[in-house]
Amino acid sequence: MAEETQHNKLAAAKKKLKEYWQKNSPRVPAGANRNRKTNGSVPEKATSGGCQPPGDSATGFHREGPTSSATLKDLESPCQERAVVLDSRSVEISQLKNTIKSLKQQKKQVEHQLEEEKKANNKKQKAKRVLEVQIQTLNIQKGKLNTDLYHMKRSLRYFEEKSKDLAVCLQHSLQRKGELESVLSNVMATQKKKANQLSSRSKARTEWKLEQSMREEALLKVQLTQLKESFQQVQLERDECAEHLKGERARWQQRMRKMSQEICTLKKEKQQDMRRVEKLERSLSKLKNQMAEPLPPEPPAVPSEVELQHLRKELERVAGELQAQVKKNQRISLLNQRQEERIQEQEERLRKQEERIQEQHKSLQQLAKPQSVFEEPNNENKNALQLEQQVKELQEKLGEEHLEAASQQNQQLTAQLSLMALPGEGHGGEHLDSEGEEAPRPMPSVPEDPESREAMSSFMDHLEEKADLSELVKKKELCFIHHWRDRCHQKTHHLLSEPGGRAKDAALGGGHHQAGAQGGDEGEAAGAAADGIAAYSNYNNGHRKFLAAAHNSADEPGPGAPAPQELGAADKHGDLCEVSLTSSAQGEAREDPLLDKPTAQPIVQDHQEHPGLGSNCCVPLLCWAWLPRRRR
């Protein structure tokens, strides 16, 4: 826009200049005009070019001829006019120059104004763009505010409805509160009446409970002395068990020594066989060399054939002996490897048995620590009967299985001992025959028969099973003792915290004692507790007899048992001990005075009806005479 205006102004100024020149320019010759256009600042040249000097004109005129004075005057007058015009033209030119300068200054000012206007327009455009962006953001914010306003209106409506519902619920709750307060006041009044009625009865009941707790304390002291005696008995049994384990360990060590000696003898035999093989190889090489030698030039016909046949037979015999010896060596090496594997397995078993012995020593040392324990009689009678039943079942299984296994293993061992000697071949036959004629060794080497080897491994598996079962029995006994001790601690804590615990609605597991009046129920519960303690004292005596009979039978083997072999003497002896233990346990069970007690009969009857009980170390509590039952 500014450039267009500037061009328009320049065009207008040019037009004005042209008009001005046209108006003020006189009619002059073309030469003068041309000189004025080319150089307007020198008027003298124009005048000199436009009119000739007077001398020239005079000479010209003189050339042409004489002129009159009138013509000279006429010529002087236009020259003067032209000089005046030129002076006026120079003044006009200076004025025009001034106007041009002023116009240039105006042009610069206009250009400066145009630049400022451009900058202002750019700023306005930038501001316009910023305003457009702000307008867009304001429109977006306006839309968001409209949506928020809509949601706020909806939430206000929802909260208004909810407040109305809550007001209704509050009214209902206030009504319910008033009803509950009225009911509570009625209940408090009835409770106060009952408390006033029962205050007189509670005093007599507390006095009776104190007397009962004193009696129970005296009974528990008696029971504590009995438990101390039984603890001493357990310590003696522990010492005997430790001595027995030491003897077993010495036997196993002796067996290991014997096996090591047998391994040494087998190695010597192997070395001798290797020497024999080397000798046979040397003889074979000699025979081959003899056969490879050339025959004499003129041998007799018949002796050469006989000699060849003899050499062939000798070669076949030596080759057969060599093959047999190689097979024998391979078999001996296999036997040695298997024997070493068996020795390693037995060492591992010995190590495990030593670890078990150490664990048993630790458990016995823990039991040896003095502890103040009390007993809950009827529950522990049940536990003892279940434990005896488990011991009987385990020992019956052990007795039946291991007596059969022992008889079979005795037969197999005798057969193995008879098959121990290997028949000799060739030059080494005398040595092997002499070894076969020796007496059977106490720890036989591994037999050649695979069936006998399998029997030997099955026998060792039976021994492992027997050891595991005996360990299971010991673990059951330890669980029984720990459970017994924990229950005693719980009972003493209960008696101390709540003296003379309630025996209301108490009865035994069988349900023989039923609930009557309050005083009668408590008396019956106290009587049942006394019967239970007496029965438990009788059970302690019977249990001591049971343990003594078990140890006596463990020291003496049964008359019908087979003679123990050197390989499994201790294991078979243990089997017989377990059988005698079951028989003694059965005898004690027949003579146990618990069966005559009315409190123990339902327990025994329940155990006979449900023989599966007792497989778990957690014993169900069936004696309710000592436990408080708060039904009301």
UniProtKB/Swiss-Prot annotation:
The cellular component terms of Gene Ontology attached to this UniProt record, alphabetical and capped at eight, are: cis-Golgi network; Golgi cis cisterna; Golgi cisterna membrane
Pfam families documented for this protein: GM130_C, GOLGA2L5
InterPro entries to which the protein is assigned, alphabetical: GM130_C, GOLGA_cons_dom, Golgin_A
Q: Which UniProt keywords apply?
A: Coiled coil
Query: Where is coiled-coil annotated?
Result: 110-201, 240-468
Keyword 4Fe-4S found: no
Chain intervals with Gly residues compositional bias? 508-520
Region entry Disordered, spans: 1-77, 352-379, 423-452, 496-524
Q: Report biased composition (Basic and acidic residues) as residue ranges.
A: 352-362, 427-440
Annotated GO biological processes are: Golgi organization
UniProt superkingdom: Eukaryota
Against PANTHER family, the record matches this protein to: GOLGIN SUBFAMILY A MEMBER 8H-RELATED (PTHR10881:SF62), GOLGIN SUBFAMILY A MEMBER-RELATED (PTHR10881)
Q: Which family does it belong to?
A: Belongs to the GOLGA8 family.
Q: What is this protein called?
A: Golgin subfamily A member 8H
